[in-house]
Amino acid sequence: MKTTAEIRQSFLDFFHSKGHQVVESSSLVPENDPTLLFTNAGMNQFKDVFLGMDKRPYSRATTAQRCVRPGGKHNDLENVGYTARHHTFFEMLGNFSFGDYFKQDAINFAWEYLTSPQWLGLPKEKLWVTVYETDDEAYNIWNKDVGVPAERIIRIGDNKGSPYASDNFWAMGDTGPCGPCTEIFYDHGDHIWGGPPGSPEEDGDRYIEIWNVVFMQFNRLADGTMEKLPRPSVDTGMGLERISAVLQHVNSNYEIDIFKTLIAKTAEIVGATDLTNKSLRVIADHIRSCAYLIADGVIPSNEGRGYVLRRIIRRAVRHGHLLGAKESFFYKLVPTLIDVMAEAGKDVKAKQTNVEKLLRLEEEQFARTLERGLSLLDEALSQVKDGILSGEVAFKLYDTYGFPLDLTADVCRERNITIDEQAFDRKMEAQRTRAQAASQFGVDYNSVIRVDGETKFEGYTEVESQAKITALFYDGKSVESIEAGQSAVVILENTPFYAESGGQIGDSGYLSTQSVTFNVKDTQKYGQVFGHIGELTQGSLKVGQSVNAIVDAKRRHNTSLNHSATHLLHAALRQILGLHVVQKGSLVSDKALRFDFAQPEAITKEQLSEIETLVNQKIRANFPVQTDIMDIDSAKAKGAMALFGEKYGDKVRVLTMGDFSIELCGGIHAKRTGDIGLFKIITENAVAAGIRRIEAVTGQNAIDWLHNQQRILTQSADLLKSDVNTLAEKIQQLQDKAKKVEKELQGLKEKAAMQAGSYFVKSAVKINGVSVIAQQLDGIETKSLRVMVDDLKNQLGSGVIAFASILDEKVNLVVGVTNDLTAKIKAGELVNLMAQQVGGKGGGRPDMAMAGGSQLENVTQAIKVAQDWLNKNL
């Protein structure tokens, strides 16, 4: 019986024997594709090839692509672990033809791999196929050439409500490449319920789709017209877990070798004995998606990809809690995962320390609120009468206790209760603090400038070139000429201008002739051409005309210093903080550099000083900045670091600075590190959960920054009648003095508050025999109000006190209740009622509670509401 690892390798070996290039799985974070949250299919990394925007040195490829499909807007995730084939993470085996072979070979390859005794050797009589209803070519290949009997070939038409909307017709989008597909199904046998595709029983588990072969032969236009593609292509996908289940003679993916091992290890760690428990399946699935997402650079956070990761981790933690886990357990599965994934586990192994650390930190963070949140949910569920949990409760769990909605849905599912998701959505919309992941992703590929050909870049060695204009764009439209005063995009045949990429800003400068001046404000890349964005200030320009292209050399030079310093900073961070540090974003301009990186913990001042010192040491070492062009595999073998989110071709540019830094980079750099002169960090802070940002300056900008700091220090010392050397000591003396005065003032306020107590006791009103004081006292801080309330409780013996005070444009509320009344009157309940009137919230003990608010105009109303509520409840 083949293991999953052996099946993966045999697939790649088979297609390699058929002339396919074996291509590594791409990252789960799609490169240069804002339309996708995660890589979810094998074709994602080849999307630009299919669109004609990218060229590869091969026309046949095969991959074992890791994919993540975490579910839809809310609670699709709750099904993972409860069905036989629903996963957050899976591997997609695929073979691809880019204008090479088409239907005949694609179908023959699939059949040979599945049925040949040399490969998988599946019984031919167990295989069924579907084709698009009008795809006679595919039908005839299956029937006449391959020999599949007609009764096992099913034509599927438009079954989704509109033309070409079918299970057997695939499209990349509303427009663009599309075409029919043929799917191969495996019949598990009549001991399992279900019918063949297209039948009323097709949702059963007997007939399972194992391979989808897409024939991209049309280009769909905006009006729905289908044009034949000049070079049709093939895109296929076969789920590794599904074919493993077939070959290992099991009906559920969770029974294949990978999952059996992960489930057994989970049970061992948490002390579970029932290996059929659904929670074990959930955890075994989730460790795969979570570990690989972190290895590919995703950090748990409250938005976008990071929030999807957080949802999955928290669901796994909750299921561990159900199994009886008493301590952090999830991260302990990583070594087992690496082992069972075999060759495909190498990316997680390379980041193992960071993966385990982030999983443990996230689990520990959630554990602090898990118990309280579950207690609140349990109480709310016990009061449900109509089988529906209110959206308000679900939102409170989300907002206060960090419960993703699908986690709450998981708990509800176990009690046959649903959630009022519409009410939840209304609360989310009102809050507007956490964006839905899907709202952050989406781009219309047809809206960008599209030009055939490519621009030859000469900027590595030149800052001035003669160049011919190949296209002009005015107001987003292609034009033949532009006139003075018009802003436009100029496309050149060759250029010294660097187009923005890799974090480095685009060059500026000008294009000119004797009678023409076009000021270039920015340079951007559109496919393979460079667009020079700016304004024509003199003369006219037309397509075909030659111009002098002249880069702003000083701006370029300063930018190059900052770019080289960014590489030194990256290497220094990894040396001092650890190899888990990976770039998450950067901006390199002529003024400064900004570098975002993965780092789960705050950086100490000492570490920051070490980092800065190390970078400056490497600057003084005056390493040559060496550039080499090589293939991607050689670069990786040399130890070159590929950056998160960047897209590389087969030939890459490797930038080396001594033995300290080696990275893939297409940017402009200094000739030697000594050219940078000086490196100074000016800010360091967190920009998101697990992501830190450093901003720094170099060269003359660093010197100017230090001069400005010195000027500020000198002015500050003069104001305090001190000198720079004793300034810190002088400030400390002033702070100590201020604290002493503040303490004395607070004592006087508290004394005055206690003396005022007798007045309030006399002004107390009786409600059903209970003394009540409800007053507005402006200008008094919360601490003094609390002292006053405590004193009044002692003086009254029995009573309720509610104070509101306006101070520094804020409302402070304090409520006190004597112990004999807390069974009837809760201070927290009353203070929250008052807080609602002033746009705030608060809480506390039954006998003492505080709140704040911002709506000063409603303070009188808050006091009145308190009086009315006490009249009603006493």
Curated annotation (Swiss-Prot):
The top EC class is ligase
Q: How is the cofactor bound?
A: Binds 1 zinc ion per subunit.
Q: What is its EC number?
A: 6.1.1.7
Q: Which UniProt keywords apply?
A: Aminoacyl-tRNA synthetase, ATP-binding, Cytoplasm, Ligase, Metal-binding, Nucleotide-binding, Protein biosynthesis, RNA-binding, tRNA-binding, Zinc
**Cofactor(s) needed for function:** Zn(2+)
For the ligand (Zn(2+)), the binding residues are H563, H567, C665, H669
* Cellular compartment(s): Cytoplasm
Give the catalysed reaction(s), semicolon-separated: tRNA(Ala) + L-alanine + ATP = L-alanyl-tRNA(Ala) + AMP + diphosphate
Kindly list the GO CC terms recorded for this protein.
Answer: cytosol
Look up the record and give one Gene Ontology term from the biological process aspect: negative regulation of DNA-templated transcription
| Pfam families to which the protein is assigned, alphabetical | DHHA1, tRNA-synt_2c, tRNA_SAD
Q: Which GO terms describe its molecular function?
A: alanine-tRNA ligase activity; aminoacyl-tRNA deacylase activity; ATP binding; tRNA binding; zinc ion binding
Please name the NCBIfam families in this protein's record: alaS (TIGR00344)
Tell me the PANTHER family matching this sequence: ALANINE--TRNA LIGASE, CYTOPLASMIC, ALANYL-TRNA SYNTHETASE
Q: What is its biological role? A: Catalyzes the attachment of alanine to tRNA(Ala) in a two-step reaction: alanine is first activated by ATP to form Ala-AMP and then transferred to the acceptor end of tRNA(Ala). Also edits incorrectly charged Ser-tRNA(Ala) and Gly-tRNA(Ala) via its editing domain.
What is said about the domains? Consists of three domains; the N-terminal catalytic domain, the editing domain and the C-terminal C-Ala domain. The editing domain removes incorrectly charged amino acids, while the C-Ala domain, along with tRNA(Ala), serves as a bridge to cooperatively bring together the editing and aminoacylation centers thus stimulating deacylation of misacylated tRNAs.
Name the family the entry cites: Belongs to the class-II aminoacyl-tRNA synthetase family.
Name by which UniProt lists this protein: Alanine--tRNA ligase
Taxonomy of the source species? Bacteria, Pseudomonadati, Pseudomonadota, Gammaproteobacteria, Pasteurellales
